[in-house]
């Protein structure tokens, strides 16, 4: 959503657009890393408490983006923001498995994947108009507000779909054993490869397009969006 603001961010932080794009790369790294962390936490503490933590972290990091004074700070905060963000993604997948049967789950997952696939295409358009009207900081205010509303909705209306398992250990050895069990399954690599191929092109375009359109071709924020 902040992609149309890369040029404005670069100007305000006295850097170049390619350096700003590193904040997007670190966000993707944070998303990948965070999913490994939240899986065990969701089994140990239930679905809602880790979700509350992640959303709160996302809100605080989004608001912190308003006060950055250099690109290094933005890159680090975007990583933290990603760690908070992926709590919702992991919890959503876990809740689908809790609440739906094996036959129903594929339909629900298909709907989730549709949202995940469409949102990166629609977000720059909304972000372009926000940035043109209110500046690039407004995007992070908007994201923080959306996360705050999600947090309230989770507290008031979202039921706990999983009873926490007190015996589940957060020690590294059993967690790594579970990961190794998954890695030994041939089917895992098939699904992982398909997912990687599907999203790699999209993310490559998303990360490089601001440099091409805004830095080289001088396209405006709304025009890029």
PLM region spans:
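Extracytoplasmic
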Residues: 1-17, 38, 205-210
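Interfacial helix-cap and linker-helix signal at transmembrane-aqueous boundaries
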Residues: 9-10, 41-42, 126-134, 214
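Central cavity-lining transmembrane alpha-helices of secondary-active solute carriers
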Residues: 25-38, 93
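Conserved MFS/SLC helix-loop-helix module at the cytosolic interface between two early adjacent transmembrane helices
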Residues: 33-72
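MFS-fold secondary transporters
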Residues: 61-66, 81, 97, 154
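Helix-loop-helix hairpin linking two adjacent transmembrane segments in secondary transporters
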Residues: 69, 73, 111-156
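Cytoplasmic helix-loop-helix junction between adjacent transmembrane helices
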Residues: 77-118
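Juxtamembrane intracellular "pre-TM" segments in multi-pass secondary transporters
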Residues: 161-191
């Amino acid at each position: 959503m902040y992609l149309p603001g890369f040029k404005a961010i670069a100007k305000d932080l006295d850097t170049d657009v390619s350096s700003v794009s590193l904040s997007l790369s670190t966000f993707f790294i944070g998303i990948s890393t965070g999913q490994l962390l939240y899986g065990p936490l969701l089994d140990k503490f239930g679905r809602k408490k880790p979700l509350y933590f992640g959303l709160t972290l996302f809100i605080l990091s989004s608001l912190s983006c308003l006060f950055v004074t250099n690109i290094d700070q933005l890159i680090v905060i975007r990583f933290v923001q990603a760690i908070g963000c992926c709590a919702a993604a992991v919890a959503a997948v876990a809740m689908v498995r809790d609440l739906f049967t094996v036959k129903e789950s594929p339909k629900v997952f298909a709907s989730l994947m549709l949202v995940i696939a469409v949102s990166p295409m629609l977000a720059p358009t909304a972000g372009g108009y926000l940035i043109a009207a209110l500046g690039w900081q407004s995007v992070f205010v908007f994201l923080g507000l959306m996360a705050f509303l999600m947090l309230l909705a989770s507290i008031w209306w979202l039921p706990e779909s999983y009873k926490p398992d007190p015996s589940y250990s957060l020690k590294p050895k059993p967690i790594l054993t579970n990961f190794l069990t998954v890695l030994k399954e041939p089917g895992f690599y098939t699904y992982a490869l398909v997912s990687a191929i599907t999203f790699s092109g999209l993310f490559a375009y998303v990360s490089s397009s601001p440099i091409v359109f805004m830095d080289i071709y001088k396209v405006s924020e709304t025009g890029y969006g």
